[in-house]
């Protein structure tokens, strides 16, 4: 008799995805981040669900309800800080996952890649709306600044912003709808993750060499299940060290002050994982130009399959491209640092140079270097 694992309509889907899945024999730890992102999503949905049981999305009580969660709810402080720092872990894994895709040419699976970029946008939107919910100073002013950017859209901008706000400023209506969207989006993300995996399993995984690995496949279970469990344990360990020893390390102290529309904080800045995009936004003196640069800084990822000029898929055997890749990483670190600095000399100039370099490396330098490396192959 055939194993139920292979015959049952539901179980066989799980079997083909996580058990009998043929996987390349040489994929490194950089391939762990997909499963880690899955774990992050599960942690965020579970902790978020328990937070939603005690949270109230009203301007009068939102801040107090978060305080109540931390003080009065059993292990409420743990749930709240796991959720807040879980978001940081989520973005660390996301950036590493995307970086892996860029380095090893995984973007040539363009359906998988494009859904991944849409997922990145969806997670960023969810994180932004989640940051507004505690209704502290940075929540309120962050929401005001970022939503206001839409007013840069010609003709419909102002109307659009007031429609999103549900009034003439960020207020009760805004908070309530942000909570509703923040609750629903993770489930939409989960559905998109399934589509992401569906397209990935049409082609199979890439591997560090970038070569076709059909001739050398191993079953996902037990080899990669045990490898994923190791990654998950490390992820949870780092998350719990962060939560239990320095839960406010990555947060902003301004968010412990209740939202006050009459008092603007000296430095309005988003959470650390948005700082690179915020720096690009601020580096252009024009409002519409800044908004376009902000959107393009992420949307540019969709151009990678078109901009790939090399005859090799992976950067494993392309030292010049490797060098530019790591300069791009250093540039993103620079942008992240600049995003958290005040708008004054020399930070303005550094930010503008780093922003120009970011787009230059992706649009011009990497494709040109790849063509040069193709020539080197003929020597």
Swiss-Prot record:
Gene Ontology MF term list: metal ion binding; ubiquinol-cytochrome-c reductase activity
Residues at which heme b b562 binds: 83, 182
GO cellular component entries: mitochondrial inner membrane; respiratory chain complex III
Cofactor note: Binds 2 heme b groups non-covalently.
Compartments where found: Mitochondrion inner membrane
Keyword flag Membrane: yes
Tagged with keyword Protein biosynthesis: no
Superkingdom as given in the UniProt entry: Eukaryota
Gene Ontology terms: biological process: mitochondrial electron transport, ubiquinol to cytochrome c
Segments crossing the lipid bilayer: 33-53, 77-98, 113-133, 178-198, 226-246, 288-308, 320-340, 347-367
Alphabetical list of InterPro entries matching this protein: Cyt_b/b6_C, Cyt_b/b6_C_sf, Cyt_b/b6_N, Cytb/b6-like_sf, Cytochrome_b, Cytochrome_b_C_euk/bac, Cytochrome_b_N_euk/bac, Di-haem_cyt_TM
Cofactor list: heme b
Binding-site list for a ubiquinone: 201
Alphabetic keyword roster: Electron transport, Heme, Iron, Membrane, Metal-binding, Mitochondrion, Mitochondrion inner membrane, Respiratory chain, Transmembrane, Transmembrane helix, Transport, Ubiquinone
SUPFAM superfamilies in alphabetical order: a domain/subunit of cytochrome bc1 complex (Ubiquinol-cytochrome c reductase), Transmembrane di-heme cytochromes
Assembly and binders: The cytochrome bc1 complex contains 11 subunits: 3 respiratory subunits (MT-CYB, CYC1 and UQCRFS1), 2 core proteins (UQCRC1 and UQCRC2) and 6 low-molecular weight proteins (UQCRH/QCR6, UQCRB/QCR7, UQCRQ/QCR8, UQCR10/QCR9, UQCR11/QCR10 and a cleavage product of UQCRFS1). This cytochrome bc1 complex then forms a dimer.
Family from the record: Belongs to the cytochrome b family.
Further comment: Heme 1 (or BL or b562) is low-potential and absorbs at about 562 nm, and heme 2 (or BH or b566) is high-potential and absorbs at about 566 nm.
Protein name (Swiss-Prot/TrEMBL): Cytochrome b
Organism: Neotamias durangae (Durango chipmunk)
Gene from which the chain derives: MT-CYB
């Amino acid at each position: 008799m055939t194993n139920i694992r292979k015959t049952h309509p539901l179980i066989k889907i799980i079997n083909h995805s996580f058990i009998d899945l043929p996987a390349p024999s040489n994929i490194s730890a950089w391939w762990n981040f997909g499963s880690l992102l899955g774990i992050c999503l599960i942690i965020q949905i579970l902790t978020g669900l328990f937070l939603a049981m005690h949270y109230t999305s009203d301007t009068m009580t939102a801040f107090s309800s978060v305080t109540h969660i931390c003080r009065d709810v059993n292990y409420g402080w743990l749930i709240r800080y796991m959720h807040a720092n879980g978001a940081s872990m989520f973005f660390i894994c996301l950036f590493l996952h995307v970086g892996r895709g860029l380095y090893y040419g995984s973007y040539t699976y363009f359906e998988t890649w494009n859904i991944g970029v849409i997922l990145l946008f969806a997670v960023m939107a969810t994180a932004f709306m989640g940051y507004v919910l505690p209704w502290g100073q940075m929540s309120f002013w962050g929401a005001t600044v970022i939503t206001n950017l839409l007013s840069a859209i010609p003709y419909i901008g102002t109307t659009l912003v007031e429609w999103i706000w549900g009034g003439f400023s960020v207020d009760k209506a805004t908070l309530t709808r942000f909570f509703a969207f923040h609750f629903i989006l993770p489930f939409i993300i989960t559905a998109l993750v399934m589509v992401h995996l569906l397209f990935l399993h049409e082609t199979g995984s890439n591997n560090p060499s970038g070569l076709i690995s059909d001739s050398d496949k191993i079953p996902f279970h037990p080899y990669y299940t045990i490898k994923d469990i190791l990654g998950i344990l490390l992820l949870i360990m780092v998350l719990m060290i962060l939560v239990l020893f320095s839960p406010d390390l990555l947060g902003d102290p301004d968010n412990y002050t209740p939202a006050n529309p009459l008092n603007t904080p000296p430095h309005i800045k988003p959470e650390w994982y948005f700082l690179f995009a915020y720096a690009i936004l601020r580096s252009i003196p024009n409002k519409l130009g800044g908004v376009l640069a902000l959107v393009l800084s992420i949307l540019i990822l969709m151009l990678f399959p078109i901009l790939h000029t090399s005859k090799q898929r992976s950067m494993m055997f392309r030292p010049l491209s490797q060098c530019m890749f790591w300069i791009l990483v250093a540039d993103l670190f620079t942008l992240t640092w600049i995003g958290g600095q005040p708008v004054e000399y020399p930070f303005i100039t550094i930010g503008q140079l780093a922003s120009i370099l970011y787009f230059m490396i992706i649009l011009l330098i990497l494709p040109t270097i790849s063509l040069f490396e193709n020539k080197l192959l003929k020597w």
